[in-house]
Amino acid sequence: RNLMVRSMAELAEQGDYLKIALDRCRHQGIAPGVSLRMNDMHDAPWPDSHHHSHFYRDNPQLHLDSHESFKHEQGRSWGGKGLDYAHQEVREHYLSLIRELAESYDLDVLELDFLRFPYYFDREWSQQDQHCEIMTEFVRQVRQILDSTGRHIDLIPRVASSPGSARQLGFDVQVWARQGIVDGITTGNFTTTSWDLMIEQFRALVGPEIAIYASLEVTADQRDGIANRHIPNNLEMLRGFAAGYYTAGADGVNTFNFFLARNHEPVTAEEFYSGQ
């Protein structure tokens, strides 16, 4: 992780790498976009990690693990240590980040990645309707920020693999579509490619005008009879997943967690750290 921090610092010293990447997309005829992880809790067990913002460190009272429903998961659930969107301060924090992105960068697409990590509220399911209302208002405010730039920026949240799971987490995609506050949605799992995304069910809720994208990830779900581990995707599997998603009515695919593009074995640790 020290290597990661040093690499990030070296990258930042070379200029505004986000602006450079977006400009190159535009130059190459690719619609430039930004994906913002809405509650990323990598390094949750290490409170001094550089992954954690000052806002997160300074406001432990806004963390999800202050709820009883998350306390029993201490040490097991990184997402359970995330920020609680029931607090207006948390929502305002993320809105400020989105405002900076929209006003400072030339982007055509903003993805709100609600799957990394998929925890936003207390696990008190009787409050599900209230959670959905809070998140719908939040997404509406995001839409207003994007529109205030004077140009259209597609808003595409990334949500769970089924409408029921999405709503349980606070994401009422049917209301979002009906109110016209999103341009599309991406459906997927937390870290793996799903064999059975409910694309038809999402389509029935959002209608024909909202684009639906299916998430393709670097690994696939484990299946019955297969060892308890993720299955690495290969080109044939990815083509099969994509064909199935398109047949089910998806408008496109969304690739996630593809760290490299090599058709051979990853480098060894010795090769990696020696820079070979």
Regions found by a protein language model. Give the residues of each.
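Short low-complexity, flexible loop/linker segments enriched in glycine and/or proline
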Residues: P47-R57, E124-Q127, F171, I199-R203, ...
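C-terminal EAL-domain catalytic cores of bacterial cyclic di-GMP phosphodiesterases
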Residues: I210-A220, G225-I226
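Active-site-adjacent "subsite" loops/lids of carbohydrate-active enzymes
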Residues: M4-D23, H27-Q28, P32-S104, D224, ...
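Short catalytic/ligand-binding loop motif for oxyanion handling, primarily in non-cytosolic enzymes
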Residues: D40-W46, P118-Y120, G164, Q222, ...
